[in-house]
Regions:
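Terminal beta-strand-rich extracellular "head" domains
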Residues: 1-69, 73-114
């Protein structure tokens, strides 16, 4: 079983997309193809106002795990054609104010014995 929760920030109000990578390649655990311009992703977060944090959360059972060492990671993109930095564990402003915070993200892998 694999699950992740990631807090991200972006300095624009577009959707963000999470992609699960297994062994350095995009996982097949991804949305179905729709229209030719639609993104396919493992997770998504609805765009909010600039400088606000968003949450990506996902959980799945990997039923054909490898018996050798395997790397898992999550990568993010956004729905804007311009270049924007995606911030992990804080919003894009990262101000030193009482109304801003830093967060924690997790990637958990549980091995289940038969």
């Amino acid at each position: 079983m694999l699950s992740y929760t990631t807090h991200i920030g972006l300095n624009t109000n577009v959707n963000t997309y999470g992609y699960l990578y297994i062994g350095g390649s995009v996982s097949t655990i991804i949305g179905d193809q729709g229209g030719s311009n639609q993104k396919r992703a493992t997770s998504t977060s609805q765009g909010v106002a600039s400088h606000k944090a968003m949450i990506h959360s996902f959980q799945t059972l990997i039923d054909n795990p490898s018996t050798s060492s395997t790397t898992y990671d999550v990568r993010f993109g956004h729905g804007n054609n311009a270049t924007h930095t995606i911030y992990i564990n804080n919003d894009s402003a990262d101000y030193n104010g009482a109304y801003y915070a830093r967060f924690v993200s997790t990637l958990t892998i549980l091995e289940l014995a038969p």
